[in-house]
């Protein structure tokens, strides 16, 4: 997962100089927490253990909608896509883009718990950028050596802030290990993408960054004992790599099936192919991996350099729909990628596959 949040100069905003008391009215009851100066309401609530609704945590999805009932707040990114249809005159805000100026009362139209049932409570850490390497012409992977170990579930993400760069980026972990002292992330370069441009430059190696997480609920748990369907576009493959690593550690594919569909434009745009081929071998026939090419017709049904990786032509959700016909029994589906791709995959999973919402876990990023 990768998504972008923008922020104005914090020094110019009328922020509180000390912790503010925040009260949140939800369908589950009223909860309270303290918010530090300059901290977003979402991050403050999450690090106190509240299961506030969120997806991207960076302003693009609109899931963390809340209404300010009393008190004064500062909105960091007025033009955030996630707030495009909000009733601003009624006090609607994105928790991930809003900071308290003083004590305030919010209303969140969702069920909220005081502590996550399965996931770790997120926290702030610092980290050092290491092992930056190009995977393709426009995709880079990198590691962040963390100031304190992090427990996370496969499929989760963190938000990263870099020195001197406006805003924050959300990235799904590629690796999986408990009490991780480093995390591996991947980013696809985009036009006017400040963080991506910085990574492709010469100054990122060894730089100090700020990390908040883990976040996200599109997670894998081996004890659910389900077949796995994974559909990813571009850098959305990151979380699927973590799921594969966790599944391999649990020997999940000894008794369960896995189907991975990875969408890229052309054969040359594929990455992690050697890792896929190795996972296929380890699964001994219980894992299928297909590289879907949206702008190129493959010369054959299999990758020429990576045995075990199948090739297909078309949009990844369409390729998955054709390949999965009649094979949706007893599975959980994971989807990650740009919103149009995710929406297309969700339609396929619900209308063709007959899956219930509880059997689908997804991340959208812009």
Curated annotation (Swiss-Prot):
Q: May I ask which residue range the UniProt record assigns to the signal sequence?
A: none
The coiled-coil regions, if any, are none
**Which InterPro entries does this chain map to?**
2Fe-2S_ferredoxin-like_sf (IPR036010), 2Fe-2S_ferredoxin-type (IPR001041), 2Fe2S_fd_BS (IPR006058), Beta-grasp_dom_sf (IPR012675), Cbr1-like_FAD-bd_dom (IPR008333), FAD-bd_FR_type (IPR017927), FNR_nucleotide-bd (IPR039261), MRET (IPR050415)
Single GO molecular function: metal ion binding
Q: Where in the cell is it found?
A: Cytoplasm
Recorded hits in Pfam families, A to Z, give:
FAD_binding_6, Fer2, NAD_binding_1
Domain of life the protein comes from: Bacteria
Free-text activity regulation comment from the record: MSAMO is inhibited by metal chelators (such as bathophenanthroline, bathocuprione, neocuprione, alpha-alpha-dipyridil and sodium EDTA) and by sodium azide, sodium arsenate and potassium cyanide.
Q: Tell me which residues make up the FAD-binding FR-type domain.
A: 122-221
Keywords attached to this Swiss-Prot or TrEMBL record, sorted alphabetically, are:
2Fe-2S, Cytoplasm, Iron, Iron-sulfur, Metal-binding, Monooxygenase, NAD, Oxidoreductase
The reaction(s) annotated as catalysed by this protein in its Swiss-Prot or TrEMBL entry are: methanesulfonate + NADH + O2 = sulfite + formaldehyde + NAD(+) + H2O
| Binding sites annotated in the UniProt record for [2Fe-2S] cluster | 56, 61, 64, 96
* Tagged with keyword Glycosyltransferase: no
* Main subcellular localisation: cytoplasm
Enzyme class of the recorded protein, top EC level: oxidoreductase
A GO CC annotation recorded here is: cytoplasm
Q: Which cofactor does it need?
A: FAD
EC number(s) per UniProt? 1.14.13.111
List, for all copies, the residue spans of the domain called 2Fe-2S ferredoxin-type: 20-112
Q: What is this protein's function? A: Methanesulfonate monooxygenase (MSAMO) mediates the primary degradation of methanesulfonic acid (MSA) to produce formaldehyd and inorganic sulfite by initial hydroxylation of the carbon atom prior to spontaneous cleavage of the unstable hydroxymethanesulfonic acid. MSAMO has a restricted substrate range that includes only the short-chain aliphatic sulfonates (methane- to butanesulfonate) and excludes all larger molecules, such as arylsulfonates and aromatic sulfonates. All MSAMO components are required for enzyme activity.
What's the subunit arrangement here? Answer: The MSA monooxygenase system consists of 4 proteins: the 2 subunits of the hydroxylase component (MsmA and MsmB), a ferredoxin (MsmC) and a ferredoxin reductase (MsmD).
Protein name as annotated: Putative methanesulfonate monooxygenase ferredoxin reductase subunit
Its lineage opens with: Bacteria, Pseudomonadati, Pseudomonadota, Alphaproteobacteria, Hyphomicrobiales
